[in-house]
From Swiss-Prot:
Species name: Streptomyces coelicolor (strain ATCC BAA-471 / A3(2) / M145)
InterPro entries attached to this UniProt entry: AHGA_cycloisomerase, Enolase-like_C_sf, Enolase-like_N, Enolase_C-like, Mandel_Rmase/mucon_lact_enz_CS, Mandelate_racemase_C, Mandelate_racemase_N_dom, RHMD-like
Enzyme class, broadest EC rank: isomerase
Superkingdom assignment: Bacteria
Lineage: Bacteria, Bacillati, Actinomycetota, Actinomycetes, Kitasatosporales
Full protein name: 3,6-anhydro-alpha-L-galactonate cycloisomerase
């Protein structure tokens, strides 16, 4: 039985200024942590994040709206608790803050389940292969070409064997020149992806895809807004590229509709905003049923368990906004891969003493 729920909010400065085509400059991110303690004293940890804004709203949803779904509930009945949270928040918001709040709780519940079972989550989820290929997600739209190459060299030195860069500069020629320079720097066979962060119109995305065709991109991510299913389906048909998307699809139904419409070819859920492991695994099943590979967005220390448990995964995104500095045992990248930890639960241990100096409110 769940006895205690603790929610904390932290504002964590980013190691460097990050920029993409839609969100502008990012100077910090907000980390929302949820700790759930059962009557036997075991505690599960979950977390989600926002960039620059919105963290207080997520934390408040957990504290004021979801706490009632948790206290006194059987922590083993995760699906039942998930449904209770979903319908409690359904009218207030079916995505964004609502599913981020649900995610943090759901992740904590699964962590608690793994801890009590003394089993890592990737095994609890069925187990496939703990070694997962990763790519370095650069948030680098404003970097000059020389710095872009330096960043790539740093990624390579850190063990990465695949890289994603940002596109969506005001002039398409700038994007072409930057991608060309990095492709030449990395070599023709190196897996290189690009992310437009929804910057382009449908016609603009098709023009950009054709202009970038010579560089043999592994995929193009979020070429336009995900809400335009018809437009994205046209991009899929006419671009000649694999089209990834999902960080802004926040429900199972969003992914179902996108897959049914043919508006993406590579689903990319984020376990910290999709509704936690519970929904992520349903999206994984949806992808498998439609003969699609599966990637992910963000929080790779958590995501690795979900991808290590399925056969149809491809490269997992690895970026943590500097959160590794506050982890006891962050995952290391070796020859382009990370290994899911064998510790019970998800195995992430945060240094709350250090984080305490960054607490908000």
């Amino acid at each position: 039985m769940i006895e205690r729920v603790r929610t904390d909010l932290y504002r964590i400065p980013l190691p460097t200024r990050l920029t993409d085509s839609t969100h502008g400059a990012m100077m910090d991110f907000e980390l929302i942590t949820v700790r759930i303690e059962d009557s036997d004293g075991a505690t599960g940890l979950g977390y989600t994040y926002t960039v620059n804004h919105g963290g207080a709203a997520v934390a408040t949803m957990v504290d004021k709206d979801l706490r009632g779904c948790l206290l006194g509930a059987d922590a083993e009945q995760i699906e039942k608790i998930w449904q209770s949270m979903w319908w409690r928040l359904h009218y207030a918001g079916r995505g964004g803050h609502a599913t981020s709040a649900i995610s943090a709780v759901d992740i904590a519940l699964w962590d608690l389940k793994g801890i009590r079972a003394r089993t890592p989550l990737w095994k609890l989820f069925g187990g496939y292969d703990p070694v997962v290929p990763v790519y370095a997600g650069g948030i680098d739209l404003e970097l000059p070409v020389a710095d872009l190459k330096t960043q790539a060299d740093r990624f390579l030195a850190g063990g990465f064997r695949a890289i994603k860069m940002k596109v969506g500069r005001p002039d398409l020629k700038e994007d072409v020149d930057r991608v060309s320079a990095l492709r030449e720097h990395l070599g023709d066979s190196f897996p290189l992806m690009v992310d437009a962060n929804m910057k382009w119109t449908v016609d603009g995305a098709i023009r950009a895809a054709r202009a970038l065709a010579p560089f043999d991109l592994h995929w193009i991510e979020e070429p336009t807004i995900p809400d335009d299913l018809v437009g994205n389906a046209r991009i899929v048909r006419e671009s000649g590229h694999t089209i990834a998307g999902g960080e802004n699809l926040h429900t199972l139904y969003d992914f179902h509709n996108a897959v049914r419409a043919g508006s993406l070819t590579l689903p990319e859920p984020d376990v910290s905003n999709i509704g936690g492991y519970t929904t992520f695994r349903k999206v994984a099943a949806l992808a498998e049923a439609n003969n699609m590979l599966l990637t992910s967005h963000g929080v790779h220390d958590l995501t690795v368990h979900a991808l290590a448990s399925v056969p149809h995964r491809t490269y997992m995104e690895a970026h943590g906004f500097g959160l590794h500095a506050y982890m006891a045992e962050p995952m290391a990248v070796t020859d382009g891969c990370v290994s899911a930890p064998d510790r019970p639960g998800h195995g992430v241990v945060l240094d709350f003493e250090r984080l305490g100096r960054l607490a908000v409110g």
